[in-house]
Amino acid sequence: MSVRIKAVASQLPPHSRSTEEIIPLVEAWLAGQDERFIRKVIKIFGNAGVNRRYSIMGPEDVFAKTSFEEKNDIYIRECGKLAETSLQKALDKAGWQATDIDYIITVSCTGIMIPSV
Protein backbone atom coordinates (compact mmCIF):
# COMPACT_ATOMS: atom_id res chain seq x y z
CA MET A 1 0.00 0.00 0.00
CA SER A 2 1.42 3.37 -0.96
CA VAL A 3 0.70 6.60 0.83
CA ARG A 4 0.94 10.03 -0.74
CA ILE A 5 -0.10 13.58 -0.15
CA LYS A 6 -2.41 14.59 -2.96
CA ALA A 7 -2.95 18.24 -2.04
CA VAL A 8 -2.08 20.74 0.65
CA ALA A 9 -4.03 23.91 1.42
CA SER A 10 -4.08 26.60 4.05
CA GLN A 11 -6.34 29.40 5.15
CA LEU A 12 -5.21 32.50 7.00
CA PRO A 13 -7.44 34.05 9.65
CA PRO A 14 -9.08 37.38 8.82
CA HIS A 15 -7.06 39.62 11.15
CA SER A 16 -3.40 40.49 10.72
CA ARG A 17 -0.97 43.03 12.10
CA SER A 18 2.76 43.58 11.83
CA THR A 19 4.87 42.85 14.88
CA GLU A 20 5.49 46.60 15.19
CA GLU A 21 1.73 47.16 15.45
CA ILE A 22 1.35 44.40 18.04
CA ILE A 23 4.14 45.50 20.42
CA PRO A 24 2.20 48.49 21.88
CA LEU A 25 -0.78 46.21 22.52
CA VAL A 26 1.47 43.70 24.29
CA GLU A 27 2.96 46.50 26.41
CA ALA A 28 -0.52 47.71 27.39
CA TRP A 29 -1.62 44.14 28.11
CA LEU A 30 1.36 43.63 30.41
CA ALA A 31 0.96 46.97 32.22
CA GLY A 32 1.50 46.51 35.93
CA GLN A 33 3.76 43.48 35.50
CA ASP A 34 7.40 43.43 36.58
CA GLU A 35 9.43 45.66 34.22
CA ARG A 36 12.02 42.93 33.62
CA PHE A 37 9.27 40.48 32.65
CA ILE A 38 7.77 43.02 30.24
CA ARG A 39 11.16 43.57 28.57
CA LYS A 40 11.60 39.79 28.15
CA VAL A 41 8.16 39.35 26.57
CA ILE A 42 8.68 42.30 24.21
CA LYS A 43 12.08 40.89 23.25
CA ILE A 44 10.50 37.50 22.48
CA PHE A 45 7.85 39.14 20.28
CA GLY A 46 10.42 41.34 18.55
CA ASN A 47 13.01 38.61 17.93
CA ALA A 48 10.67 35.78 16.93
CA GLY A 49 11.35 36.33 13.23
CA VAL A 50 7.64 36.86 12.60
CA ASN A 51 6.92 39.94 10.52
CA ARG A 52 3.15 39.56 10.33
CA ARG A 53 0.86 37.87 12.84
CA TYR A 54 -2.52 36.45 11.89
CA SER A 55 -5.38 35.81 14.27
CA ILE A 56 -8.99 34.72 14.34
CA MET A 57 -9.57 37.67 16.67
CA GLY A 58 -8.78 41.35 16.24
CA PRO A 59 -5.78 42.43 18.32
CA GLU A 60 -7.94 44.41 20.72
CA ASP A 61 -9.91 41.23 21.46
CA VAL A 62 -6.78 39.07 21.76
CA PHE A 63 -5.42 41.26 24.52
CA ALA A 64 -8.75 41.89 26.26
CA LYS A 65 -9.34 40.25 29.60
CA THR A 66 -11.27 37.10 28.82
CA SER A 67 -11.37 33.76 30.54
CA PHE A 68 -9.79 30.58 29.26
CA GLU A 69 -13.27 29.24 28.53
CA GLU A 70 -14.24 32.30 26.48
CA LYS A 71 -11.07 32.18 24.38
CA ASN A 72 -11.40 28.43 23.95
CA ASP A 73 -15.02 28.80 22.80
CA ILE A 74 -13.87 31.31 20.19
CA TYR A 75 -11.12 28.90 19.14
CA ILE A 76 -13.55 26.00 18.74
CA ARG A 77 -15.99 28.09 16.71
CA GLU A 78 -13.48 29.84 14.46
CA CYS A 79 -11.01 27.02 13.82
CA GLY A 80 -13.81 24.93 12.38
CA LYS A 81 -14.52 27.65 9.82
CA LEU A 82 -10.85 27.91 8.84
CA ALA A 83 -10.53 24.13 8.63
CA GLU A 84 -13.60 23.84 6.43
CA THR A 85 -12.32 26.49 4.01
CA SER A 86 -8.86 24.93 3.90
CA LEU A 87 -10.29 21.46 3.34
CA GLN A 88 -12.44 22.69 0.47
CA LYS A 89 -9.40 24.32 -1.14
CA ALA A 90 -7.45 21.06 -0.87
CA LEU A 91 -10.35 19.05 -2.29
CA ASP A 92 -10.70 21.45 -5.21
CA LYS A 93 -6.96 21.37 -5.84
CA ALA A 94 -6.95 17.56 -5.86
CA GLY A 95 -10.18 17.25 -7.84
CA TRP A 96 -11.60 15.05 -5.09
CA GLN A 97 -14.78 14.73 -3.06
CA ALA A 98 -14.72 14.53 0.74
CA THR A 99 -15.49 10.80 0.52
CA ASP A 100 -12.18 10.27 -1.32
CA ILE A 101 -10.13 11.18 1.77
CA ASP A 102 -8.65 8.54 4.02
CA TYR A 103 -6.69 10.72 6.42
CA ILE A 104 -6.41 14.39 7.38
CA ILE A 105 -3.39 15.91 9.13
CA THR A 106 -3.81 19.23 10.92
CA VAL A 107 -1.68 21.47 13.08
CA SER A 108 -3.28 23.50 15.82
CA CYS A 109 -2.55 25.56 18.92
CA THR A 110 -5.30 25.58 21.50
CA GLY A 111 -6.89 28.79 22.67
CA ILE A 112 -4.97 29.11 25.94
CA MET A 113 -3.78 32.64 25.19
CA ILE A 114 -4.09 33.35 21.51
CA PRO A 115 -6.31 30.88 19.66
CA SER A 116 -4.67 29.77 16.44
CA VAL A 117 -4.82 26.92 13.99
Segments from the language model and where they lie:
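Conserved catalytic cysteine-centered active-site region
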Residues: 51, 55, 108-117
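Short glycine-rich or small-residue beta-strand-to-loop segments that form or flank ligand, phosphate
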Residues: 102-108
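Conserved active-site "lid/cap" helical segment
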Residues: 1-102
